[in-house]
Amino acid sequence: MSFQHKEIEKKWQTYWLENKTFATLDNNEKQKFYALDMFPYPSGAGLHVGHPEGYTATDILSRMKRMQGYDVLHPMGWDAFGLPAEQYALDTGNDPAVFTKQNIDNFRRQIQALGFSYDWDREINTTDPEYYKWTQWIFLKLYEKGLAYVDEVPVNWCPALGTVLANEEVIDGKSERGGHPVERRPMKQWMLKITAYADRLLEDLEELDWPESIKDMQRNWIGRSEGAHVHFAIDGHDDSFTVFTTRPDTLFGATYTVLAPEHALVENITTAEQKEAVEAYIKEIQSKSDLERTDLAKTKTGVFTGAYAINPVNGEKLPIWIADYVLASYGTGAVMAVPGHDERDFEFAKTFGLPVKEVVKGGNVEEAAYTGDGEHVNSDFLNGLHKQEAIEKVIAWLEETKNGEKKVTYRLRDWLFSRQRYWGEPIPVIHWEDGTSTAVPEEELPLILPKTDEIKPSGTGESPLANIKEWVEVTDPETGKKGRRETNTMPQWAGSCWYFLRYIDPHNPDQLASPEKLEKWLPVDMYIGGAEHAVLHLLYARFWHKFLYDIGVVPTKEPFQKLYNQGMILGENNEKMSKSKGNVVNPDEIVASHGADTLRLYEMFMGPLDASIAWSESGLDGARRFLDRVWRLFIEDSGELNGKIVEGAGETLERVYHETVMKVTDHYEGLRFNTGISQLMVFINEAYKATELPKEYMEGFVKLLSPVAPHLAEELWEKLGHSGTIAYEAWPVYDETKLVDDEVEIVVQLNGKVKAKLQVPADATKEQLEQLAQADEKVKEQLEGKTIRKIIAVPGKLVNIVAN
């Protein structure tokens, strides 16, 4: 008989909620364990089977740690601001708050149906004013410290939609929605100075227990490079520009320079003859994204401005070009070109017939750029030197002559923090008519997002909030000065930068969280989520955390001590699950047909947690069959406990039980859930062969199963005669002495060929092994008519009889 999963799961889910079984104890006597999931965006589509993979992993750890005596913090919440809800509101005219609440209710229902041991009293929602009050408070602190500032930044402006689009919403120069043309246009935007933390974000990665691949992605994103700034005067002008180069030693090889088309100097230095060509080129590249412009594979384009720069090292005139591969937002927006020793410069020079000079020996620069090390030539005071010495010498010369200086730069840009959207946290700043700006006073937070019947683009590039005049227009009660509220909102990243801190003290009206509680719970012990957040979310969260550390709010430099990325669950055809492919598996259907415990067990048993694996219905059926076998081992068809279960421990199953406790504990701790479950299966197979089932071992098994299949385990625990929940029962421990084999298997060989296998006492001596081998019936048969010449016995391994 199989167990009735619908009844059992409903029964225990109701019990856990009513009894607040998983409420965090906040008990300072106990060691803490903080297990965190990347909280989901509550989409209209609901949960898919990929979500529970990571959630089950943290749940197994949380349940085990509670049983091991830890005080466990295991919370869940909603990253609920964001574009889809706004888009829904634009399309339907409905309030995104209503849509978001429906989605959250659905997500919560689905998550509770999977039996995760979350403390629901700590549930948070980034769109709740009591939550985003503190998101706004952090912004004010950044603003006070000069880390939030306004700058003119090129953005993706779509005239037809009357709005600014994120890079992800632009495909081949057109809007993803409706395919309207998109152009780059400078606009005032809020920026956060993450670059001020670049070195610390880089250095502190060393202290984290994170996958090396994720650390590398962050290192590359930060992109620290050492080199020099070189100043170039412009011939016939008072202006000059600066370039950054990692190879200042090749300065003698520069044959032209390139400015970004948006560079402030372009208009001023372009000659009358080149004006038309330059303006046409700038217009042509306006719709290109930064990614398209810097694509290494594309054909190089550019236009000569007619102006020349002076090479500071030798006074040579170098033509100044503009080209789209140089970005105004990156570095200084200007580069010196050394085509003999840089591949991109070489390609550009060949395309436009510009000269190529050799200044480092080692290749044939007429055919290809030589980027390796070598002796410097045609380089005056650098001749004969190799790369490192030449770099040091030329930097010393640049600094001495005031033509440049040593410089460290980063690929990391400051974080563009404003969005021209309605559905986000309002930025608490007021711009006054006299040109000044002030922050909304702390005591007036939260600055609540106003309700509106009409969420539509403003048409000016401002957010839809600009349409709500009564909210936007303010008057200073003291001076009568008129002002306008900031109409940009924060990006979705803002709420997820610090949510793990609010879980620690979610209802505190006076502080982001109490210092004592932060001291107790930080850092997060285990953070599990998808690798797609490897860079942005994790980098932004680390930045905010370091800032909060600097102002004394949090006690740790880093938020997440251990990070783990679960793999992806693919469709049965090994393709990514997506609505368009029609291969999405809905967990609701699996919970109805197979049960939540089966889904949890199957997702953990599919393979290693970090691997991407295809969904398989037969695998799901196999997981259910195992749980049915467990049920039938304990419960007779009559519903009574199996009569073979006897009080106490006893020798039956002793060794396999202790081995199971050891392996399952070790595998769960190491997130190797698939091998932990395999060992549970080994135990069940052995138990089916046994004539009696010692109760102590059967109860221990139920405890080991409970983190993976908690509903079934609770029901079996009750059937074994216990009242209340298994959740805080002591985790089993193993006895090492019980793991030693009393017997071992040895092979018996005749003239080197295996003839028999014997079970012998583990401590049998050579003499005993010789006697046991010769006494075996099979061996006797083989020896008939032969004379034994020699016997070699190796205790614990083999006996080899030489006979003829």
From Swiss-Prot:
<feature type="short sequence motif" description="'HIGH' region">
    <location>
        <begin position="40"/>
        <end position="51"/>
    </location>
</feature>
<dbReference type="InterPro" id="IPR009080">
    <property type="entry name" value="tRNAsynth_Ia_anticodon-bd"/>
</dbReference>
<keyword id="KW-0067">ATP-binding</keyword>
<dbReference type="GO" id="GO:0005829">
    <property type="term" value="C:cytosol"/>
</dbReference>
<keyword id="KW-0648">Protein biosynthesis</keyword>
<keyword id="KW-0547">Nucleotide-binding</keyword>
<keyword id="KW-0963">Cytoplasm</keyword>
<protein>
    <recommendedName>
        <fullName>Leucine--tRNA ligase</fullName>
        <ecNumber>6.1.1.4</ecNumber>
    </recommendedName>
</protein>
<keyword id="KW-0436">Ligase</keyword>
<keyword id="KW-0030">Aminoacyl-tRNA synthetase</keyword>
<feature type="binding site">
    <location>
        <position position="579"/>
    </location>
    <ligand>
        <name>ATP</name>
    </ligand>
</feature>
<dbReference type="GO" id="GO:0004823">
    <property type="term" value="F:leucine-tRNA ligase activity"/>
</dbReference>
<dbReference type="GO" id="GO:0006429">
    <property type="term" value="P:leucyl-tRNA aminoacylation"/>
</dbReference>
<comment type="similarity">
    <text>Belongs to the class-I aminoacyl-tRNA synthetase family.</text>
</comment>
<dbReference type="Pfam" id="PF00133">
    <property type="entry name" value="tRNA-synt_1"/>
</dbReference>
<dbReference type="Pfam" id="PF09334">
    <property type="entry name" value="tRNA-synt_1g"/>
</dbReference>
<dbReference type="InterPro" id="IPR013155">
    <property type="entry name" value="M/V/L/I-tRNA-synth_anticd-bd"/>
</dbReference>
<dbReference type="InterPro" id="IPR025709">
    <property type="entry name" value="Leu_tRNA-synth_edit"/>
</dbReference>
<dbReference type="InterPro" id="IPR014729">
    <property type="entry name" value="Rossmann-like_a/b/a_fold"/>
</dbReference>
<dbReference type="InterPro" id="IPR002300">
    <property type="entry name" value="aa-tRNA-synth_Ia"/>
</dbReference>
<dbReference type="InterPro" id="IPR009008">
    <property type="entry name" value="Val/Leu/Ile-tRNA-synth_edit"/>
</dbReference>
<dbReference type="InterPro" id="IPR002302">
    <property type="entry name" value="Leu-tRNA-ligase"/>
</dbReference>
<dbReference type="InterPro" id="IPR015413">
    <property type="entry name" value="Methionyl/Leucyl_tRNA_Synth"/>
</dbReference>
<dbReference type="InterPro" id="IPR001412">
    <property type="entry name" value="aa-tRNA-synth_I_CS"/>
</dbReference>
<dbReference type="GO" id="GO:0002161">
    <property type="term" value="F:aminoacyl-tRNA deacylase activity"/>
</dbReference>
<dbReference type="GO" id="GO:0005524">
    <property type="term" value="F:ATP binding"/>
</dbReference>
<dbReference type="Pfam" id="PF08264">
    <property type="entry name" value="Anticodon_1"/>
</dbReference>
<dbReference type="Pfam" id="PF13603">
    <property type="entry name" value="tRNA-synt_1_2"/>
</dbReference>
<feature type="short sequence motif" description="'KMSKS' region">
    <location>
        <begin position="576"/>
        <end position="580"/>
    </location>
</feature>
